[in-house]
Amino acid sequence: MRPQNARQIAGEPAAGPGPAATGPRWRLPYAPRPRFIQLETVTACPAHCPFCPQHEITRDPARMPDATWRRIVDQTRGLGITYRPFLTNEPFVDKRQPEITAYIKRNDPTARVEYNTNASLLTADLAARLLDAGVDIMRFSIDGFSPATYGPSRVGLDYAQVVANATRFLELWDAGGHRATTFTEVRMIEVPENAHEVGAYRAYWGPRCSEVVVTQLYQWPWTGQRREDVVRKPCLKVLDEMFFYTDGDATLCCWDVHGRAVVGNVHERSVLEIWDGHVMRQLRALLDDGRRDLITLCSRCNAYAGFDFSKFAATPGDDVVSGDTTGQ
């Protein structure tokens, strides 16, 4: 971690120092190496969703240099990584995605490529090129089953065009014999305004894709959470995932839009050195003790507030801060 980022990690306690440390309260099964890597290849998105802080991104460069994403991929070949070439952006703003997919898959049978897209830019040509390149997972975020319910949540996108693009991709996927090799998912965030459409949504998309998912809206960190309401629990997002910005900075979490928890840079240290480095170990130890209040980003995050972490309860003398999650 670079010195100028040190202040971004440790903050003041949210409600006093708490009891004296007697060892971790939990011991989460952190993977010895990442299993998922997200690459912010660009920072742009054509949508202006009211629930997403994407428009607040001011990172430079706006486009990840080829040398950066290739460096990350090359350093992790053969490790069974699922690469996600997007972060808080629409992946297909970046016209390099078929090339990126092909590069990741080249000479690495363990590598997988996954996209989550709003489908607004997914042309027939792009769909065919992605399938030919060997994309493994394609998830479509379509929050509604009518223009009236879709429009307010995905501001700036045309519902009919999005449905047409996603449907065409799925038709190419089906006709091309990709059902056995590429998983497809259509997902909707359920809100009161579209809850009445869930049945019709499932009926339409269910036969056309591998799976339909109806999920709930989550709250991004630092979007109104109060300091005194800090969640004193660990977090599942840091078990086996890494996240890289366009400049090669690695951050603790995919919800870190403003770079509050930068843990290293791939141009200064290798991917695995960052993953198993001192900063990450410190952060894992804090999270295992439920001390989100001492991590600036996490001190205003309520993710997993209702999750039961009891199965990860620490036992006396258990002081290992990294371990394989295989079989968990």
What kind of region is each of these model predictions?
Residues 40, 79-86, 104-114, 132-142, ...:
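Conserved C-terminal portion of the radical SAM core fold
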Residues 236-238:
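Short, small/polar residue-rich loop motifs at catalytic or cofactor-binding pockets
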